[in-house]
Every structure is written in C-alpha cells, then in structure tokens.
From Swiss-Prot:
Similarity section: Belongs to the rotavirus VP7 family.
Glycan-modified residues: 67, 152, 225
Species name: Rotavirus C (isolate RVC/Human/Japan/88-220/1988)
Protein name stated in the entry: Outer capsid glycoprotein VP7
Subunit structure: Homotrimer; disulfide-linked. 2 Ca(2+) ions bound at each subunit interface in the trimer hold the trimer together. Interacts with the intermediate capsid protein VP6. Interacts with the outer capsid protein VP5*.
Known function: Calcium-binding protein that interacts with rotavirus cell receptors once the initial attachment by VP4 has been achieved. Rotavirus attachment and entry into the host cell probably involves multiple sequential contacts between the outer capsid proteins VP4 and VP7, and the cell receptors. Following entry into the host cell, low intracellular or intravesicular Ca(2+) concentration probably causes the calcium-stabilized VP7 trimers to dissociate from the virion. This step is probably necessary for the membrane-disrupting entry step and the release of VP4, which is locked onto the virion by VP7.
A Pfam match: VP7
Subcellular location: Virion; Host endoplasmic reticulum lumen
GO terms of molecular function: metal ion binding
GO cellular component: host cell endoplasmic reticulum lumen; T=13 icosahedral viral capsid; viral outer capsid
Lineage, opening ranks: Viruses, Riboviria, Orthornavirae, Duplornaviricota, Resentoviricetes
N-terminal signal peptide: 1-49
Amino acid sequence: MVCTTLYTVCAILFILFIYILLFRKMFHLITDTLIVILILSNCVEWSQGQMFIDDIYYNGNVETIINSTDPFNVESLCIYFPNAIVGSQGPGKSDGHLNDGNYAQTIATLFETKGFPKGSIILKTYTQTSDFINSVEMTCSYNIVIIPDSPNDSESIEQIAEWILNVWRCDDMNLEIYTYEQIGINNLWAAFGSDCDISVCPLDTTSNGIGCSPASTETYEVVSNDTQLALINVVDNVRHRIQMNTAQCKLKNCIKGEARLNTALIRISTSSSFDNSLSPLNNGQTTRSFKINAKKWWTIFYTIIDYINTIVQAMTPRHRAIYPEGWMLRYA
C-alpha cells in the first residue's frame, strides 16, 4: 500500500516535471511568438501608412476632398497671365489692359458668382514664358495659363504648351564635361534664358563627329537661336556635343511623364485665321487647350469666367502629376 502511494506520488511529480519542462516553456514560447507577430504587424501597417502619406505629400496648396456634386468645391484655382497686361490705373483707357487697380478683387468676386468659394481664386503674373521652366510652380487644384498668341511666337507657344500640359523631370546639364544623348521620344532638352543660341554635333561610337567636327563649333548644327525657351529634340541614342552661351541660357535634360491633367492652356489670338473649334464658346476640345479671339483683356477674363465650367470639365482636379522629388514644374 505504501509502495503504491509512493508510485502515485512519483508519477504525479513526474507529470508536473514534464509540464514544467515542456508545456510551460511551450506556452511561453507561443505567447512570445504571438506578441512578436502583433508588434511586427503593427510596424508593417505603420510603414505602409507612411509610404502612402509620402506618396501624396507635396509642397504647395493641399486641396480639400472634391465634392462630386460641386466640382468647384476645391481649395484653389490659379490663373497665370502676363504682367505686361496690367496697365496704369485710370478711367477711359483704350489700350485693352487691366487698368483697374482692384482688378484682382473684381475677377475673384465674379468667379464666386460661378460657385467658387471665397478666397479660392489666385491670380499670378509671369514676365516671360520661360518662367514656367525656371521659377513658376503650379500647385493649385486647378491651373489655367493664359498666353498671348502671335504668328511670330507660334513655335515657342507650341513648346510651352507641351511643357505646361505635361509633367517633366529634369536634371542640370554640365556642357563643359559631358556629352549627352537622348534615350527616347520622351527625352528632350529644355533650354531657357535671355538668348538661347544652341548648336549640336552628333558623335559616332568612336567620338568622331557625324557631319561636323567636335573641335570646331562652326561646324555644329543650329537647333535653337534668338529664343527664350526651346524644347530641343535630337536623334535618340546618339551622343552629342553641345555649344551654347551658358551665361545667357540654361539647359536641362528632361524626361516627360504623364499629362498634367489639372492644368489648361488658353491662347489669346487676334489672328484672322483663328481656329474656332478651340473656342470655349463652342465647347472647345478635350485637349485642355483653348483659344480666345479678343484684344481687350477684360473681355478675355469675362469670357473665361463665363465659360469656366467648360474649361474646368476638360481638366481633372488634384491630379497625380504633382509629385515630390522634383516632379513639379520648376524642375519637372
């Protein structure tokens, strides 16, 4: 009887020993594993949240959530126009300029009659079209750029339209050290300055000139001269030597990204060969490019205000085109 009881006690002690040795350690192991998994999952969720925030963050005006029933319920509409059209103040002026000292307040108030919130209209002037490469950043919910159109400036206007309506990513070019090549149809060189006279010499695989002598700039082919802005296209995948006056012009190596869908261009024309299909009065086209045939700038702004719905419907608010990392108009 004593032996049986002793055997029973020994068996119980053995079972407790096994439990302490194995099961309790396993319980702690399982518990520790669950805690580690919980911590890691929270860290993963946090890192994904940070990535999402980084993706949508940019410097500039951050729009509110777009209300589908009220397309003008946005943070800002920026309108860019030449500062040369702001004339001297006084009644009876016939030059067609904005001669009213309160023109900005007048225009903003008229936009409010079309449903735009108070304070959402921002008027900005520029000196020359090359400013859009060098210094102007367009970060409003909607951006409208007004450019005077003339036959003498048709090439530069076409190129600035290409620049404004798309996203570009650019790097500075050091012409004293490097030769450059364009790697695809979306790779262009953007030149801007007071006088961009640029010539190039294409090179073969042995660095000899193709139709030119690299050592003689007089043999280079002229691709731009007497211009403040140029988007230069050369043959892809061919290295080039480039000659220009770096004191009067700057050059950037640029890659075109996607369309800047929150931006529209309005060209002001007085040409008799005006293309009426581009007029907002006829609903325009879906290319985010319009023309207004007028000489008086108050008439131009009245037309833009009255047909702003047509213009804005061709755009998309808060487009992905506004990125950090240089995907802004200044460097883009």
